[in-house]
Amino acid sequence: MIGEKDLAGDGECSRTKTSKPRFSNLNNQTHQDDKTGQYHQKGVDFLNVRSNNLDGGFSSKSSPRSGNELTLSYLCENSGKLAESLGQKGKEVVTFSENSSYDDKWVERDFFNLREMNPNSSKRKAHEEEEEAEEEEDKKSNKIETLNLSLALPDVSLSLTASNAVKRPRVVTSERTTTSFSNDFTATAPSMSYSYSHPFSHNISCSMTRNSTDFDCSVGKDDHIWCAGEGTNGSVHSRFRPIGDGGVALANNPVSGKPSSSADYSFFPSELPARPGNEVTISGDSRKKVANLEDNDAVRSERVLYDIVSKSISSVALIIQGMADETLESAKEYLRNLIDSPEKKEKLVNLQNQIDKRSDLSKETLSKCVKDQLDILVAVRTGLKYFLSGKIRIPMNELVEIFLFLRCRNVNCKSLLPVDDCECKICSNNKGFCSSCMCPVCLRFDSASNTCSWVGCDVCSHWCHAACGIQKNLIKPGHSLKGQRGTTEMMFHCIGCAHKSEMFGFVKDVFVCCAKNWGLETLIKELDCVRKVFRGSDDAKGKALHLKANEMVKKLESKQISPLDASNFIIQFFNYAESIPEIPDPPRELTVAAETSYRKDEASVTPSTSKDQKKKSFALTDAMMNSFDSLESMVRIKEAETRMFQKKADEARIEAESFKRMIEMKTEKMEEEYTEKLARLCLQETEERRRNKLEELKKLENSHCDYRNMKLRMEAEIAGLLKRMEVTRQQLV
């Protein structure tokens, strides 16, 4: 039964903590009193107040008919007859009986008949019928009394429909009264109530884990929103949820310290969904619990990854198919953290070692993997986390080939390995190395293109990071391949084929083709790379390019020049640099001769002890130093250079004549060999033709003989026939 008014006439709260009120049965419209139970109650107070402030302020004024009431009803009679006596709001006045003979019984709340207040809800009726059928089956199967863990008032009959309740002896217990508050935003006014804390029982009519009126855990499923106490079946405890120590706390209490979750909504009726309150403070125990939960998640994720990399493919595939999506996503997130965190590199290496130890990971077995399982295996082995994201879709067969190092792990390349069947030491010694997109020094790849930061070999097409080449001294001065003998230029020494590729022309081609499309930051990076490459250059072109790149970088950083103008200046410089003559290094002989002449001139100066002599000696020394740069010294240097070049020219002429003689000898020898081979070839062809003609002649002779023999035989046969014809004619005549 639901009390329609819970306040006294003067508007104040009716509160009795020490008295023992006795509740009588509800007087129904049919005036049927089957049985009456007297119930004992201690300290049950009903407070109905209106709140003008949601922040916790309460007033003593209330409206008896307002929708902000919290009403409680207790069942005394048959639950089937209760629905007929209820009004449209399901409320009746509670009457008290002073002379009831049953003091040891408490009335259990009616959690089912109130659902009849919305007869148009077919979904609610269907749920009620299903739950009632389940209750009947449970009662038939379980004849014993359930464990007393109920939220219902003490000493209540376990059956809602029992007409004769068995008396139980009164047990005097000291019960603690707890005050509970609610700031439920779905109700129109906050409420406050006093309730006892009783042991809980798994009673399906009032469960801590199930709502008493609706067994559907989804909040907001029903279409009717109940106000105040309506829709909660008069249950104060339906507004509460359990906490760790088994006590009762407000469901929306902001200082409870426990964050709301989807599981908490199962304690609220679907007609009156509760919003979780804002958390104000979090206790130290809660922080410890959160930390422990995070540690447990990490341990569980690590265990999942270890099972994936160590256990058989088929068993893990079955496990993953039955695994929750949250667990699998947590394992992937843990693996992403392993890849991103350098301090956790050892754990990632251990997982990779587990994979390397396995011998059953073939193409056939890996084809039986689940997609998520194969993604994790590939991500662990390659150390790349983008295989774990669902944005990149790679076919299963390509993932298997990437795992087995048969295909490039760069998703922008994915070339079959080795590229172009390369057999160099880099491609053969490094599994999974792709010469199209990976650096042979650091074995890494990136998506950079049309840039000077990647340097390529002219022969084997291996590409290397310019920074790696400078660090490993692969980009250094070398003898020029196109210029004069004795000149040097910056070269890239390929470690794959040991070929030398010149850098000046490569940088020029890149700037001419791509510089106009670069922005400010890109142009600064490219010029900085060029500056680093040509920093140790010895030739005039390289030094000039280094200075020009340094100048352009400073101007671009200070925004003295636009990127387009800077790129035009660099391109003009490359065109101008082609006309710069390559000056060879000064010959060692010339340097030695100059040093010797200077020492002789210096030795010819006689020292003097007087000041004048010293001044003269200093002046003479200065004159000697200046005379080294005079015209005579330049003439001597030029003469020495002329003699040196003449000597080299004579040597070159002699060498050229020797090469010419060798060529003539080789030519004569080749002509003789050619003539002999041609004659031999002609003789063989003639003999072959003669042999073919003889065979044809023999065939003709044989055919002629056969024809002659056949002709003679036919003539003989014809002559015999004529003779017989003549004889026959004579006989007839």
UniProtKB/Swiss-Prot annotation:
Offer one Pfam family short name for this entry: Oberon_cc
Record-level Gene Ontology MF annotations: zinc ion binding
- Bias class Polar residues marks the residues at 21-30
Give the boundaries of each PHD-type zinc finger: 436-500
Q: Which domain of life is it from?
A: Eukaryota
By its UniProt entry, which InterPro entries does this protein fall under?
OBE1-like_PHD, OBERON, Oberon-like_PHD, Oberon_cc
UniProt keyword annotation of rRNA processing present: no
Coarsely, its chief localization is: nucleus
Question: Where are the stretches annotated Disordered?
Answer: 1-42, 118-142, 592-614
CDD domains named in the record: PHD_OBE1_like
One GO biological-process annotation of the entry reads: cell fate specification
| One GO location term (cellular component) | nucleus
Compositionally biased, Basic and acidic residues: which spans? Answer: 1-15
Coiled-coil ranges per the record?
A: 120-153, 644-733
The knockout outcome noted for this protein's gene is: No visible phenotype under normal growth conditions, but the double mutants tta1 and tta2 exhibit a rootless phenotype and seedling lethality. No visible phenotype under normal growth conditions, but the double mutants obe3-2 and obe4-2 exhibit broad growth defects and developmental arrest of seedlings.
Disulphide bridges, residue numbers: none
Quaternary organization: Self-interacts. Interacts with OBE1 and OBE2. Interacts with OBE4.
Record's function text = Probable transcription factor that functions redundantly with OBE4 in specification of the hypophysis and establishment of the embryonic root. Involved in the activation of ARF5/MP-dependent gene expression during embryonic root meristem initiation. Involved in shoot meristem homeostasis.
Spell out the protein name for this chain: Protein OBERON 3
